[in-house]
A protein has these predicted regions:
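Preference for long, amphipathic alpha-helical scaffolds in soluble/luminal domains
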Residues: 1-206
Length: 206
């Protein structure tokens, strides 16, 4: 592979070690070119599903499908529902009934326009929100929804239409709710972190 020529050493063997099934799962596909149905890939995912990090996250889910707080999918960071599902997707976890319960809970946060906010809508007015400043949240949701095989769901189509629709050609990106509240934190007007997350999510669609 051409990219290996610029490295001081070939890390492939290390990345394929059995002790980290998530890294092995992705390396087999992205570096070795093995298809998802390849026996080695499926075996790595089987091991991943029983790994301590995955079991800890799945076991923390509440019976209703959420993690931590039902009304807030975002806080506390890295433990709440959207973070838990994102981490599981990034690790390479497969879709299961537990995952499906979590995703159905996430869809409760979707507004009529297709986008997501962190709090459950309590009124028709709240569900009618068309806030166009949360590309990072929408992108994270799209990433794990795509990973878990929901792209044909009409609710996801609405999300995709919303994301594409609020891209700013003039500013070459997506606006962030932190600008201009704190201009020093995000510059320029479009958010490079939100754009990176959005492009990553869109890249999963084939």
């Amino acid at each position: 592979m051409a990219w290996k020529q610029i490295l001081k050493a070939d890390p492939t063997e290390w990345l394929l070690e059995q002790e980290d099934p998530s890294v092995r799962f992705w390396a087999l596909q992205d570096l070795e070119g093995k298809v998802f149905d390849h026996p080695e890939v499926k075996e790595a995912q089987d091991v991943l599903m029983e790994s301590p990090p995955v079991r800890a996250i799945l076991d923390a889910q509440q019976p209703e499908g959420h993690w931590v707080h039902r009304e807030d999918m975002y806080l506390p960071k890295y433990k709440a529902t959207t973070h838990s599902l994102l981490i599981l997707a990034e690790l390479g976890v497969r879709r299961t009934p537990v995952i499906e319960r979590g995703l159905e809970h996430i869809f409760e946060f979707q507004r009529d326009s297709g986008h997501f906010l962190t709090n459950l809508p309590k009124t028709a007015k709240g569900r009618a929100s068309v806030v166009k400043d949360g590309c990072c949240l929408d992108a994270s949701v799209l990433y794990y929804i795509s990973h878990f095989g929901y792209l044909d769901d009409p609710r996801v189509v609405r999300l995709l239409d919303f994301i594409v629709g609020y891209h700013s050609a003039e500013e070459a990106g997506w606006k962030c709710r932190a600008f201009p509240i704190d201009p020093d934190a995000v510059f320029p007007v479009n958010c490079y972190m939100g754009a990176a997350k959005t492009l990553r999510a869109l890249s999963t669609i084939s």
